[in-house]
Amino acid sequence: MERRLIPGHSPYEAVVGFSRAVVAGDRVHVAGTAPIPVEGDPPEGAYDQTRLCLEIIGGALERAGATFADVVRTRTYLTEAEDWPEAGRAHGEVFGEIRPASTCVVVKALVDPRFRVEIEAEAVLSP
């Protein structure tokens, strides 16, 4: 089985020892992705944070040879239940009719108190 590491730009990757994504056979597993911009601070609102998370995930998918159309599952973690409409709207704008299996849960906190959203994704590479 092929196992390929896809790095990202998160400072946590080297410290914790993880990859943004791992390709294992025909599967792409994208790690929990927080709204960490290349430069500057994360956006404030749940909608903008979700869009940034998905943009980062999209880049990892591309480097793995996949697209959003290959995504079969997402998991969204929110720190505030009232953020689900905005996070859901951003998710829906990106995935549209792709409609991956999706779970959204509310957690007590994320690693950085500025983070309101974190998203994981799984994709299957096309033959």
What are these regions (language model features)?
Residues 1-127:
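Short, polar/acidic, helix-capping and beta-turn segments at strand->helix junctions
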